[in-house]
């Protein structure tokens, strides 16, 4: 017998003789212990504020698809090719005459999104390059003047409206094409360009005009997603116009005022990982590709495990999540990217009950490697961090479930109320999950549902589970 087995056998006899273990502890599906503790436990259990108006659709549809598509898709390097690649403006604009996405089919995009459980879409109407995907009257640098000659946004909007699939619009304030934009060589800006006549006031009027077009000519809009407003000079009139024209539109925090929600991007700022729940509305955004948001010919992709963990990390804290793909120049989402999205759907659909209409209650356990949500008399355990082994400790939670189920495939999960050998001095049994199939599911994120006869979470203030740090979602300038 090796040392671990010997100590385990010896330790099993000691607490049993002292009456410290619950003799009735069973695997999932067995009888609950008659001597389970009656002490109530509790957690934060707070949702971020709802709007109380037409924007509340956003809390019913929490998982969306982001799409980055533009002239940069022709080159297939990066969506910021012109800036990062140091491509002269005149040379870059030669891509304009090549734009002809013959296989663009927005219904194919939406089919893929819905197959993964996504319920809304956010589309780049104008990225930093300044190219406009709609029939704008304010610049000729738009899709109608290309060989394609069709309003790409119109086609997408029509497809979305046929399905009652909310459409959100991305719009970059930075513009590398407009001679009015004050390019000064700051981050994500070109150097001052010959022949430009920068005028901030006139450019803001240009932006307002384009926003009015977008919010007037394409039916109901679910959201407006600003990006890269470098000056950060506040102008509440612009978002006010959006709200007047599109009352159901949620607006992010990257525009001319603080907007409705924060936007953590990729894992650039790890402080977003620290709160157990958010006080301000949040929509995280991530791409399937590691290097680019737009189409990249030589892209390396994130693993399924990484992406499902990222989704769980935010959804379990009452946040929305946007997952991005970059169609190629023909309008086709690369097969590898599409396969990743479909695979995420096979994970998301069985476990989504653990996210939808649940409360974040992670404060009831000291285990920082899991997140907990609650719905009625059920708790959901999200193993968003790769587990070290087959056991998950939920200390100090000491309530016996009636059953425990692995949502990924529906199999029962073993559990016990007992004392871990290394914690024998505490003499306080708590709930532990056992023999989880971590090797079999090593490439994905496990979610366990615990069903209780009655679940009273009042009484614990979460002191043992408080995470350090502040909530970055309160910072309207967070990116």
Report the location of each language-model feature.
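N-terminal export signals
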Residues: 5-27
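Mature catalytic domains of secreted/periplasmic carbohydrate-active enzymes
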Residues: 8, 32-479
């Amino acid at each position: 017998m090796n040392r671990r087995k010997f100590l385990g056998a010896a330790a099993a006899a000691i607490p049993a003789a002292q009456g410290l273990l619950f003799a009735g502890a069973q695997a999932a599906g067995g009888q609950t212990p008659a001597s389970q503790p009656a002490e109530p436990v509790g957690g934060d259990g707070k949702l971020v504020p709802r709007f109380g108006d037409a924007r509340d659709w956003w809390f019913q549809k929490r998982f969306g698809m982001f799409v980055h598509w533009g002239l940069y898709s022709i080159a297939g390097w990066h969506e910021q090719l012109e800036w990062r690649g140091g491509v002269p403006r005149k040379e870059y604009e030669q891509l304009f005459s090549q734009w002809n996405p013959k296989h663009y089919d927005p219904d194919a995009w939406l089919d893929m999104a819905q197959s993964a459980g996504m319920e809304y879409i956010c589309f780049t109407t104008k990225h930093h390059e300044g190219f406009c995907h709609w029939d704008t009257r304010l610049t000729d640098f738009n899709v109608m003047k290309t060989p394609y000659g069709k309003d790409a946004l119109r086609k997408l909007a029509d497809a979305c409206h046929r399905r009652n699939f909310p459409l959100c619009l991305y719009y970059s304030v930075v513009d590398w094409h407009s001679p009015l934009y004050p390019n000064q060589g700051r981050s994500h800006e070109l150097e001052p360009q010959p022949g430009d006549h920068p005028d901030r006031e006139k450019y803001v009027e240009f932006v307002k005009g384009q926003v009015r077009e977008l919010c007037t000519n394409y039916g109901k809009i679910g959201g407006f997603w600003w990006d890269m407003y470098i000056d950060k000079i506040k102008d509440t009139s612009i978002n006010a116009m959006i709200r007047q024209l599109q009352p159901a539109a949620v607006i992010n925090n990257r525009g001319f005022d603080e907007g409705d929600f924060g936007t953590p991007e990729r894992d650039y700022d790890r402080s977003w990982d620290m709160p157990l729940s958010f006080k301000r509305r949040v929509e995280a955004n991530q791409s399937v590709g590691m290097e680019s948001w737009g189409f990249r010919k030589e892209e390396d992709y994130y693993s399924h495990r990484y992406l499902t963990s990222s989704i769980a990390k935010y959804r379990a804290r009452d946040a929305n999540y946007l997952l991005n793909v970059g169609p190629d120049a023909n309008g086709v989402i690369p097969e590898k990217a599409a396969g990743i999205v479909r695979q995420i759907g096979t994970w998301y659909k069985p476990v989504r009950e653990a996210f939808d209409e649940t409360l974040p209650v992670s404060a009831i356990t000291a285990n920082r490697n899991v997140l907990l949500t609650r719905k009625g008399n059920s708790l959901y355990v999200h193993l968003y961090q790769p587990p070290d082994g087959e056991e998950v400790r939920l200390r100090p939670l000491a309530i016996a479930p009636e059953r425990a189920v692995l949502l990924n495939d529906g199999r029962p999960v073993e559990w016990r109320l007992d004392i871990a050998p290394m914690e024998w001095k505490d003499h306080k049994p708590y709930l532990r999950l056992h023999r989880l199939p971590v090797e079999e599911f090593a490439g994905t994120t496990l979610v366990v549902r615990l069903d209780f006869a009655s679940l009273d979470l009042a009484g614990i203030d979460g002191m043992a589970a408080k995470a350090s740090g502040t909530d970055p979602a309160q910072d309207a300038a967070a990116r």
